[in-house]
Amino acid sequence: MSYDPADLPPRTGSNLPEMSVGDLARALKRTVEDAYGYVRVRGEISQPKRHSSGHVYLRLKDETAVLEAVCWKGVAARLSVRPEEGMEVVCTGRLTTYPGRSQYQLVIETMELAGEGALLKMLEERKRRLAAEGLFAPERKKPLPFLPEVIGVVTSPTGAVIRDILHRLADRFPRHVLLWPVAVQGEGAADQVARAIAGFNAIAPGGPVPRPDLIIVARGGGSLEDLMPFNEEAVVRAAAASAIPLISAVGHETDTTLIDFASDRRAPTPTAAAEMAVPVRTELLAQVLDDGRRLHQCLSRAIDTRRSHVEGLGRGLGDPRALLEGCIQRLDDRAERLELSLRTGLERRHAAVQQLGIRLRHPREVIGLAAARADAAGRALRAGFDRAVTVEQGRFHRVADRLSPLPLRRQIDAGRDRLDALPPRLAQAHARRLDQAGQRLVALGQLLESYSYKGVLERGFVLVADAEGRPVTRAADTAPGQPVALRFADGTVGAVVDGAAPGASPAARTRAGKAKADQGSLF
């Protein structure tokens, strides 16, 4: 016969002590912590969540149960594995309860992947996700510089890796190396490597610290767990975002990490990375010397070919001196004709100036005529004023006879005043008119002087006359032994012609017209 405990009558007056909810929760907490203490739990991570405070909350589950877990901020920063959804891990920590929600939970202190298979599965899933974002795309790869001036190396400062890289660079082509020391395994290694890559990219060109032209991220061989920092997402993203070309040299040739897919070039070993970074200096020198010899041979052959071609063309050309002789003769002929033309033009213009000087009046004559005209104009003006005064006086007298004496007298007095003022004004106007006429006469005299032959003589020319005083204007009008007179600006001297132009014949001589007395004769 079965029974239900609910069918039993309630116990009253029991000896069980009465407990509050808090007391019971604290008792359960002590019981659980005392009974289990540290435990090691294997399970699959579910719903991992990193709080803004830095703490990580997650669940560990298997086919039958779920266990709440928490990883405090200080421990989460030191974990060798970043918690991800679906990752199978083994966690070590303390089992405790959380009275606020009446649940028990695991306080994680260490976390590791549950076997290499689970680790590889996680890496493959991460690789697919990052590849889907395009971080491994071939078009993102940057070419390596042929000969970098500065090489940045991200590795441990105490390992054999940095010594191998420096030794190999010294053997091939010594370069300036900047070492950014980092931890290459263990807690915090991934963050240090990512910060080192970003730090090299943050160096400004031209600053006190030279900016690398190439970055090498290197580490020696190790187990899969040892190489895990180079599989971390932060390192992969830093390598993909690097503006400086990057070579990954992590592990041995058989080791592959996710940074190898994001880097611009993968080297199987750190030594191979140094070989990729720089060429062999001796090989370059040999190649340069060989190229120099080949270039010299090429230039020599080209020069010989061009020389032969030019010599062949030269043989087909005539003598350049023969080409120039005709040009020289034509040039001499043109020069002789130009000289003759200039001389003839100068003589023609000289004769024209002399004729103009003969036809011009003397300035004193022009000034006298202008003064006479001015005097006549003044006399006519005075006579006109006198006539006008007489006419007005007559009009005044006639009007005076018709008007009363007093107004007429006033008008007469005013008219007399105006009439008295007219002679001074007339004299002033006459004087101004004479001054203006005198100024014009002076200007005309200066103009006449500029056209006179005397001005020509003062500029250094000479007037030639024969014994009878007639001007000699052509060389053909002279004969050897003929006496001539040479008139300068300050006087006249005698001279005798010592020769005549070849082939010149005396031309018909014309008697110059008699110059006016006021202008003065040339002789």
UniProtKB/Swiss-Prot annotation:
Location of region: Disordered: 502-523
Broad class of where this protein is predominantly found: cytoplasm
Enzyme class: hydrolase
GO BP term, pick one: DNA catabolic process
Record bears the keyword Nuclease: yes
EC number(s) reported in the record: 3.1.11.6
Cellular component GO terms, alphabetical: cytoplasm; exodeoxyribonuclease VII complex
Reaction(s) the record says it catalyses: Exonucleolytic cleavage in either 5'- to 3'- or 3'- to 5'-direction to yield nucleoside 5'-phosphates
Highest taxon above the source species: Bacteria
Location relative to the cell: Cytoplasm
Keywords from the UniProt entry: Cytoplasm, Exonuclease, Hydrolase, Nuclease
InterPro entries linked to this entry: Exonuc_VII_L (IPR003753), Exonuc_VII_lsu_C (IPR020579), OB-fold_nuc-bd_dom (IPR025824)
CDD domains registered for this protein in UniProt: ExoVII_LU_OBF
Gene Ontology molecular function: exodeoxyribonuclease VII activity; nucleic acid binding
Purpose: Bidirectionally degrades single-stranded DNA into large acid-insoluble oligonucleotides, which are then degraded further into small acid-soluble oligonucleotides.
Subunit structure comment from the entry: Heterooligomer composed of large and small subunits.
Protein name: Exodeoxyribonuclease 7 large subunit
Organism: Rhodospirillum centenum (strain ATCC 51521 / SW)
